[in-house]
Amino acid sequence: MSTPSATVAPVKRIPYAEASRALLRDSVLDAMRDLLLTRDWSAITLSDVARAAGISRQTIYNEFGSRQGLAQGYALRLADRLVDNVHASLDANVGNFYEAFLQGFRSFFAESAADPLVISLLTGVAKPDLLQLITTDSAPIITRASARLAPAFTDTWVATTDNDANVLSRAIVRLCLSYVSMPPEADHDVAADLARLITPFAERHGVINVP
């Protein structure tokens, strides 16, 4: 008697156009990052980035719209790293909110402090265009990063409600972005402070669904 074969769930494939666009954006942003390692943002043009990425200036314009749009795309990717760090730290510290937040925040702040665009923002000539991206014009970054971060609280051991996950996500993204534009003193452990601030809410509203 033969046993029924296990049903294999179909692999969700990313449409070609979507995958191609993501690859293009990453290639352009990687090229921009490489340029920022040796030049200040104020000295970089769309043509410079296009040459470094091996594509036309028009292609960059079509994808990002402008030099400011390119900077916003870079900032969005940096915010994605915050989401990835917090999600990974929750996976690595099941049942321990404080350690999860502490690890996630420390990883993000270390990465952002070493990021060439952030360094360019904080050094050299004033760059109001970059500062606007994470202050007055930060809504797109906050909205996207918060939406991506929320499932880390609803779909993991934390198991909050959607509403509480949104509260946590927005607070984390807004607070972390504020420290990118105005870093704390060198002897101040802001990651620990934020972990202490966020943990009580998460402990109160999370189910902590640990097997």
Curated annotation (Swiss-Prot):
TM region positions: none
Q: DNA-binding residues per UniProt?
A: 45-64
Q: Does the keyword Chaperone apply?
A: no
Question: What subcellular locations does the record give?
Answer: Cytoplasm
Q: Name one GO molecular function term.
A: transcription cis-regulatory region binding
Q: What activity regulation does UniProt give?
A: DNA-binding activity may be regulated by fatty acids.
Q: Which Cys-Cys disulphide bridges does the record give?
A: none
What is the recorded function of this protein according to its Swiss-Prot or TrEMBL entry?
Answer: Represses the expression of the alkB-rubAB operon, which encodes the alkane hydroxylase AlkB and the rubredoxins RubA and RubB. Acts by binding to the promoter region of the operon. In addition, EMSA analysis show that AlkX can bind to the promoter region of mmpS1 and mmpL3 and to the intragenic region of mmpL11, suggesting that it may participate in the regulatory network that controls the expression of MmpL lipid transporters.
Question: Under which name does UniProt file this protein?
Answer: HTH-type transcriptional regulator AlkX
Q: Which organism is it from?
A: Mycobacterium tuberculosis (strain ATCC 25618 / H37Rv)
